[in-house]
Amino acid sequence: MNLVMALLTNTALASLLVLIAFWLPQLNSYAEKTSPYECGFDPMGSARLPFSMKFFLVAITFLLFDLEVALLLPLPWATQTTNLKTMLIMALTLISLLAISLAYEWTQKGLEWTE
């Protein structure tokens, strides 16, 4: 019973704080607060310019491959384990996954910058 009361109290308090944080800034809105900010200078253009979807997809692909390569970093220390065969199988599986992913991106023209 005490756990249920604590959970309900915490949920209610968290919900109340979220609602306050959402509605309180909307009550005090003025032009300077809603204007774009560019390093202390007056903005050169609109802050809501559209960006290239191709750039976004290449950036996401880079992040995914970067995270997968980061999984390869502990491999030199993993060679010191007693079960070397399992480590080699896992490493080759990860490298194969990277190669297959790169080949797929290449065939789908996901790495092409121009169309």
From Swiss-Prot:
Superkingdom field: Eukaryota
Keyword Mitochondrion included in the entry's annotation: yes
GO BP terms: mitochondrial electron transport, NADH to ubiquinone
UniProt topology in membrane: Multi-pass membrane protein
Keywords: Electron transport, Membrane, Mitochondrion, Mitochondrion inner membrane, NAD, Respiratory chain, Translocase, Transmembrane, Transmembrane helix, Transport, Ubiquinone
Enzyme Commission no: 7.1.1.2
Transmembrane spans: 3-23, 55-75, 86-106
MF terms (GO), sorted A to Z: NADH dehydrogenase (ubiquinone) activity
Pfam families in UniProt: Oxidored_q4 (PF00507)
Keyword Mitochondrion attributed: yes
One Gene Ontology cellular component annotation held by this UniProt entry: NADH dehydrogenase complex
Cellular localisation: Mitochondrion inner membrane
Gene3D superfamilies: NADH:ubiquinone/plastoquinone oxidoreductase, chain 3
Primary localization class, coarse: mitochondrion
Catalytic reaction equation(s): a ubiquinone + NADH + 5 H(+)(in) = a ubiquinol + NAD(+) + 4 H(+)(out)
Function, as annotated: Core subunit of the mitochondrial membrane respiratory chain NADH dehydrogenase (Complex I) which catalyzes electron transfer from NADH through the respiratory chain, using ubiquinone as an electron acceptor. Essential for the catalytic activity of complex I.
Entry similarity comment: Belongs to the complex I subunit 3 family.
Assembly description: Core subunit of respiratory chain NADH dehydrogenase (Complex I) which is composed of 45 different subunits. Interacts with TMEM186. Interacts with TMEM242.
Name this protein carries in UniProt: NADH-ubiquinone oxidoreductase chain 3
The gene coding this protein: MT-ND3
